[in-house]
Amino acid sequence: MSLPSIGSVGSDRMAAYMHGQQVYTGQFGDPNLTPPQAETQMSAQASAQAVGQEPEPDYKLVIRQEPQRARVAQGKEKGTDRKPIDPPPIVQLIRTARSDPAQIYLQSPYYFMACTLIKGSDDDPDPNPNSMLGTLVSSLHKLRDLNNEDGGFFIFGDLSIKIEGVFRLQFTLFQMKDSTCVFLDSATSQPFTVYPQKNFEGMAESTFLTRSFSDQGVRLRVRKDSRAMTTRKRNHQHAEVAKKHSEWDRKQTSAVSRHSSINENDSTPTDTRGLASFAGAGSSGYYDQHRSHYGETYGHDTYYGGARSVKRARHEVSPGQYALPDLPQQAYATRQPSFSDSVASMTMPPVTTAAPSLAGINPMSSHHGYTGSAHPGFAPHRINTQVGGSHLAPQPHSAIGSVNQGYQSPSTHHQPHPHTAHPAGGQAYPSPSPRQSPGTAPNYHYGSHHSQQTPVSLGLETYTSAGVVGMPGPGQLVGTSAPSPHLGQGYRHGMINEPGA
C-alpha cells in the first residue's frame, strides 16, 4: 500500500477550502464583509428583487431651498451692489445606512459640489457657460438641521447671473479619490427668472433655514425685511406718532376752551393773552410744515393732515374770547407811569376834577421819580363828607412841605395866601404858583423822607376831623363846584376845585 504524496494532499485541501467559500458566499454574501453588514446587504437585495425594483443608491441629493428670483449682474458692481440669487440655493447630501451606517461622510473633506447654469426649458437655447459670477463650488458643511439632527449641506450664498431670462441650476456631486475626481450624483433645480435692474422687485426676507445656518457660522446675507416691508412699517410708525400728537392737541384745545368759558362767567376781566398764545401754539409748530404730506400719506384726519382739524381748533379757540379791557390812554399820552401810579390805580378809581392846591408843596420834580397822582392833572383825594361837607381830608404833605422849603425852584415866586394861618414861629408857608397846567400834576419831593410811604401815595383814604398844621380851614375853601358829569354813579359828591381856577 503506497502513501499519498504531499502535493496531492495540498491540492485536495485547497479544493475543499474553495468549496467552502462558495457555499458561505451563497448563504451569507461577500466573505470580506462582517456578518452584520453581510446580512443587511443580503436582506436589502432580497427585498428589492422580490418587489421588482432597483436597489436604493448609496448617495441621494435633496434640494432644500430652491432659487426663485435674481437680478442681472453687470460684473462691475462693488461690495453689496451685486445682488445674489434669492434665496440662496441649499442642497443636502444623504447617504444610506447600508453604505455608511456610522455617517462618517459628514466629516469627510473629499466631497464637493459644482453649480452650472442650464436652460429653463427644452425650447430655450443653452446659455453661455461664462454667464455666472460668484462662488460656483461649495464644500460639504456639517450643520444641525431644523429637526435638531446633523446633516451634510452644500450652500451657494454668492451666485449671480449676467444675462436675463428663465434658467435652471444643475448641481453635480464629486468625490476625490487618490488623484482622481469621481462623479457621484447630480440634481436640477426648478426654473427661475433673472430680471433686469429696473424690473427687479428687491430681495425678500431671509428664510428660517437661512437664518439658522447663518447663526451656525455660514457666511450668508441675512435680511430682516425687504425694502417695501420696511417702508410700510416706517409709515405705520409715523401714523402712530401722528395719532398720538392729534390726541394730545385735542386735549389741550378742550382744556383751553373750558378755561375760556370760566373767564366768560367771571365778572373780573382776566388777561388771558398767555392762554391765547398757548392755544395758538397748539395748532402750529414744526409738524404743521408737513401736515399736508402726512395727511395724503395716511388718508385720515390727523394732526398733520387736512385743514379740517386745524380749522376746528381755531374755531374752538377764538381770539375774540380773550379781548382785553379798555385802558385809559390819557396817562400814556402825557408822561411815563411811575411806581406810585401803579399802586394808586389798583385801589382808587380815576378822578376827573382838579386837585386842590396845598400850601408848602414843592412843585419841583423829584429826583426819585415819585409822583402824587395816578393820572396827569388829577389828584386822588376825596372829601370827608361824613364829618362835614366842606372839610378836606388831612394831607400829610403839608407837614413835609416845611422840610423841603430849601429845595424850591428859584424861578417860582410864592405869595402867602390871605387866609392861611401862620405857625408859631411867625413864618408863613409859601403857597404854590397861582395856576398850573392841567396836564401836569404837582410832583412831591420827599427829600430824605422818600422811604416813608404816605397814605395818599399808597392809595388809601384818611378820614379824621382833626386839622393839620398848614392846611386851609373850612372858611378858606374857594370855588366849590359839583362833580363832572363824566364821573360814575358811585362817585362821592363834594370835590373841591383848585383855588383860583
UniProtKB/Swiss-Prot annotation:
Residues 26-55, 67-88, 228-274, 378-455, 474-501 are annotated as: Disordered. It is found in: Nucleus. Belongs to the velvet family. VosA subfamily. Residues 67-85, 237-252 have a biased composition (Basic and acidic residues). It comes from Pyricularia oryzae (strain 70-15 / ATCC MYA-4617 / FGSC 8958). GO terms for biological process: sporulation resulting in formation of a cellular spore. Forms a heterodimeric complex with VELB; the formation of the VELB-VOSA complex is light-dependent. One of its GO terms (cellular component) is nucleus. A motif (Nuclear localization signal) lies at residues 364-371. Residues 52-223 form the Velvet domain. This is Spore development regulator VOSA. PANTHER family: SPORE DEVELOPMENT REGULATOR VOSA. The keyword Nucleus applies. Keywords: Nucleus, Sporulation, Transcription, Transcription regulation. Component of the VELB-VOSA heterodimeric complex that plays a dual role in activating genes associated with spore maturation and repressing certain development-associated genes. The complex binds DNA through the DNA-binding domain of VOSA that recognizes an 11-nucleotide consensus sequence 5'-CTGGCCGCGGC-3' consisting of two motifs in the promoters of key developmental regulatory genes. Appears dispensable for the development and pathogenicity. Residues 35-50, 253-271 have a biased composition (Polar residues). The keyword tRNA-binding does not apply. The N-terminal velvet domain contains a NF-kappa-B-like fold and is involved in DNA-binding.
